[in-house]
């Protein structure tokens, strides 16, 4: 039984490993040249992986990748899915395009969506980041660690990541302004630490309406001030959004449903609304998105496929309760 796994982050690698144990044949499809997903750029300590105190996301990813590469798993790198349709003989036909190669078709019996998530930003801020290297989208960027020193930094966002990075940067001599459109929603301990730090300014109900790229930074214009305020760096911390656009590659008749925030909808067995299609990791709505969560769900998705096979085929969304 062939299982196509879309994405080679922690969820995808875990799913492939588990498929082998369950007698399934995984084929991993990864659009980048490496495994690991966004954790490849995570220089922060991973607080959620029990048994690995002090280990960064990058180091953890290296360990996962080393194990994954030791497995007998067919992995298609630099490959994107162009279209997915039901196959006449059952299962699915995936039209693939690999970099530098002609288009190809892969027939599979099941599909697992493990495409992860990416930092969220408005189209205007994404365009600004394309125009200026002084604009950083999201927390997983080594520029934050290696190049922001004794500088003026503006952080947009009011959650844990925004406050945690304000503290991280202030401790390295940066003067940090944190701007959120409403109130701060981060943990109270982080908020208290930021309030107490002399190099951090917190601005709730702050609605900067214009940002302009400059030679050595970014200028921000506040609606209540006729002047612009210069910063050396702009850091956008608006959280994350799921990489669920892959569902648009499915034929409309078999397109998995998404919720209002774009997460792929699944039941307790990680089955989507389409029989034979599963999803795991950050592409679905999790109580706590984290590497351990993704690893566990990759395993669970493989188990669900194996269990469905022993129940006479794929079980529909919400079924197989026992």
Question: What do these predicted regions represent?
Answer:
Residues 17-18, 165, 280-322:
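A conserved FAD-binding loop/helix module that cradles the flavin
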Residues 2, 78, 149-152, 205, ...:
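Phosphate-coordination loops involved in phosphoryl transfer and adenosine-cofactor binding
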Residues 65-108, 171-263, 307-322:
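A Rossmann-like FAD-binding core segment of flavoenzymes
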Residues 129-147, 237-290:
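FAD-site-proximal beta/loop scaffold in flavoenzymes
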Residues 1, 24, 110, 150-153:
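Nucleotide donor/acceptor-binding cores
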Residues 2-73, 163-188, 258-259:
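Beta1-alpha1 glycine-rich phosphate/pyrophosphate-binding loop at the start
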Residues 115-167, 172, 264-267:
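Glycine-rich dinucleotide-binding loop and its adjacent helix/turn
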């Amino acid at each position: 039984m062939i299982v196509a796994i879309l994405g080679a982050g922690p969820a995808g690698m875990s799913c492939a490993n588990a498929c082998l144990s369950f007698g399934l044949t995984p084929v991993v499809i990864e659009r980048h040249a490496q495994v690991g997903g966004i954790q490849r750029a995570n220089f922060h300590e991973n607080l959620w992986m029990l048994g690995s105190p002090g280990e960064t996301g990058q180091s953890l990813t290296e360990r996962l990748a080393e194990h994954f590469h030791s497995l007998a798993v067919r992995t298609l790198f630099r490959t994107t899915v162009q279209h997915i349709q039901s196959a006449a003989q059952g299962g699915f036909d995936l039209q693939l395009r690999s970099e530098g190669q002609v288009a190809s078709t892969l027939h599979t019996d099941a599909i697992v969506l493990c495409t992860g998530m990416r930092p969220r930003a408005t189209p205007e801020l994404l365009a600004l980041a394309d125009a200026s290297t002084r604009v950083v989208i999201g927390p997983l960027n080594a520029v934050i660690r290696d190049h922001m020193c004794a500088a003026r930094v503006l952080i947009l966002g009011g959650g844990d990541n925004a406050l945690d990075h304000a503290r991280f940067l202030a401790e390295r001599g940066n003067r940090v302004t944190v701007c959120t459109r409403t109130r701060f929603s981060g943990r109270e301990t982080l908020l208290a630490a930021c309030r107490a730090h002399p190099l951090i300014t917190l601005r709730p109900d702050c609605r900067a309406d214009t940002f302009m790229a400059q030679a050595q930074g970014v200028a921000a214009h506040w609606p209540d001030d006729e002047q612009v305020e210069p910063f050396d760096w702009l850091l956008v911390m608006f959280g994350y959004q799921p990489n669920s656009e892959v569902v648009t590659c499915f034929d409309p008749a078999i397109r998995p449903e998404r919720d209002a925030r774009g997460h792929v909808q699944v039941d307790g067995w990680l089955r989507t609304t389409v029989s034979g299609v599963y999803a795991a990791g950050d592409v679905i709505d999790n109580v706590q998105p984290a590497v351990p969560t993704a690893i566990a769900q990759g395993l669970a998705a493989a188990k669900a496929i194996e269990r469905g096979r022993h129940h006479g085929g794929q079980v529909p969304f919400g079924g197989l309760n026992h």
